[in-house]
């Protein structure tokens, strides 16, 4: 499995915790963050980190180019447009999508 086959989206502490679980299970992945600050905070993970916002069409292209099979949406709960675009992009590309839900 290559890094692009699993995509974790989010610059939150929850996303980093999920990445550490993937590290412990020896699962290759890419963490996608929107900002350089998010990239700097991701410094302790083993996966590849991509930085920059993606619009719907860019998401579809990235998923196809990287042969992504699973996306984990761990974006901030208020990032509704990101989650909406991810849902549409995964449906278009035929990719499994899981949404991380923060415990209350």
Q: Where are these predicted regions, by residue range?
A:
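Small-side-chain structural scaffolding
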Residues: 11, 15, 19, 52, ...
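Glycine/small-residue-rich loop that forms an oxyanion/phosphate-binding "nest" at active or ligand-binding sites
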Residues: 60-104
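Phosphate- and divalent-cation-binding pockets in alpha/beta enzyme and binding domains
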Residues: 17-18, 40, 58, 81-85
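Glycine-rich, highly charged phosphate/nucleotide-binding loops
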Residues: 45-64
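Electropositive, gly/pro-rich neighborhoods at or near active sites that engage anionic ligands
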Residues: 7, 21-25, 33, 50-54, ...
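Extreme N-terminal starter segment of soluble prokaryotic enzymes
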Residues: 2-6
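N-terminal glycine-rich anion-binding loop in soluble enzyme alpha/beta folds
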Residues: 10-46
């Amino acid at each position: 499995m290559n890094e692009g086959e699993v995509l974790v989206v989010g610059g939150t502490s929850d996303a980093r915790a999920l990445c550490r679980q993937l590290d412990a299970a020896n699962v290759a992945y890419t963490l996608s963050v929107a900002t350089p600050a998010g990239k700097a905070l991701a410094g302790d993970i083993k996966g590849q980190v991509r930085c920059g916002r993606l619009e719907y069409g860019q998401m579809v292209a990235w998923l196809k180019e990287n042969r992504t099979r699973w996306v984990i949406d761990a974006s901030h709960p208020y990032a509704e447009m990101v989650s909406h675009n991810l849902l549409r992009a995964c449906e278009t590309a035929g990719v499994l999508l899981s949404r991380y839900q923060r415990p209350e």
